[in-house]
Amino acid sequence: MSLRPVYIRAISSLGAEDPDFRQLFSPLEARRMGRLLKRAVWTSRRALESAGLAMPDAIVTGTDFGSMIQSEAFLGALKQGGDATPRPTNFMQSTHNTIGSLIAIQLGCHGYNATYSHKGNSFRSALQDAWMQISLGDIDTALVGWFDEAFAPVGSSDKAVSVVLTASPEGAMGTYEALLGTLLES
């Protein structure tokens, strides 16, 4: 069996500054989402728009630490007042797979969805998973993301990168192999 080539069709990323999320989320939606989730959905939608793709076959995300701010808020409330006081939103948003799940819910995507949480190897693992599935012919497109927030106690920094991988060379920026080093440096 020969492997199919894999191409990068679009990349979207955010620096430390946030865009105007009101363009994408209603006030009610925005209140229920932490900053990390807003940034993840934002870059994912922008990458898909840039790629001219409405729905990927798979969503694969990587996060070094997940939403540490939500985890800290949940555990702090639990410590302060026992199990009666924590906000459920803080707990739900503290799990690492919440990022990929929310992107899938927002898009209505019912395909393959996986999250990698391996500290410095998370994004590489997510890219490898998507590359393998496309090159083997299991899927044709994948939305791959790397999302983290600045949290001093663990030395993490803001990351919001979304990449659309595809089996089709049409509209591609280049091959996966040619651009891999650039992606991992972002």
Where is each model-derived feature located?
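Conserved "HGTGT" condensation-loop signature of ketosynthase/thiolase-family condensing enzymes
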Residues: 1-112, 117, 121-125, 132-139, ...
